[in-house]
Regions:
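Short, surface-exposed interaction loops/tails
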Residues: 31-35, 46-49, 55, 66, ...
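Phosphate-coordinating loops and pocket residues in cytosolic domains that bind phosphorylated ligands
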Residues: 22, 27, 63, 70
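N-terminal single-pass transmembrane signal-anchor helix
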Residues: 1-25
Length: 137
């Protein structure tokens, strides 16, 4: 049979392997979330440009990014709205579950798009840093 010492050795080895996996996988997951947020912002930028081409104006700040998935009630040129919208419903949420922030007209460009990062608060560093559609300097 298996002795208690052999069992403890096996459990120690498994714990050691698990620790190595956790230390190496978790940072990669965080990097992937930041990368996804950057890609999402690019996709939303393209959807906003398509909306403007069809509707002749960007959605207002009040209409927000919801205007990309459902026709706003106060939209002019409603007959020009693309059937099915410009992004799928719920796509305007960052990898941490927070809505992307949209402002038109923007302070840094035609429009501003922002993810407040993992903490969902403006500012921050590292994983909590804002991810934006303009060059920060």
């Amino acid at each position: 049979g298996i002795t208690l010492i052999e069992l403890l050795v096996v459990l120690t080895i498994l714990a050691f392997i698990s620790a190595i996996v956790v230390v190496n996988v978790l940072p990669e997951r965080d990097k992937a979330a930041v990368k996804k947020a950057k890609i999402d912002i690019g996709v939303i930028e393209s959807a906003l440009d398509q909306y403007r081409l069809d509707m002749m104006v960007y959605p207002s700040t009040g209409q927000g990014l919801a205007a990309l998935s459902a026709l706003p009630a106060d939209a002019a040129n409603a007959d020009q709205f693309r059937p099915g919208g410009y992004i799928r419903r719920g796509a305007a949420v960052d990898p941490w579950g927070h809505p992307y922030q949209y402002r038109f007209p923007g302070e840094h460009g035609v429009f501003d798009l922002t993810s407040f990062g993992a903490d969902g608060e403006p500012g921050g560093e590292g994983l909590n840093a804002d991810i934006v559609n303009w060059v920060q300097g």
